[in-house]
Amino acid sequence: MTKTKSQIGKSSKARGKRGELDLVHSLRDAGFPDVKRTVQYCGKATGTADLVGLPGVHVEAKNVERLNIWSALAQSKRDAEADGNGNIPAVFFKRNRSGGWYVAMPLSDFVRLYASSDLCKGDVNK
């Protein structure tokens, strides 16, 4: 049976929601208790992160079989700039129904994030 465009859209939206909730739980388990999904309706407004509560980071979550990383990075950057809060754009991604989460961001943003961490100050056990 072939799916209609409407069915494909609903399936994609549901997969995205499941992925975002999975990422919320993974980040909370990692020690970030304030992470939550943003309110989304009729798609989402440009500049809105998929998740909030991870200080300094604009989260774009992708739960797909095949990810166009360049497109996802561009979307994350565009949305983070639209937010106007200076958060670092990052794409959190995983393969649908398998594996763990990965993070992609430009090297310059990673350096900025890392430089502000305790790891850069030599306190790796904190």
Give residue spans per PLM region.
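Catalytic phosphate/metal-binding cores of nucleic-acid and nucleotide-processing enzymes, i.e., regions
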Residues: 1-126
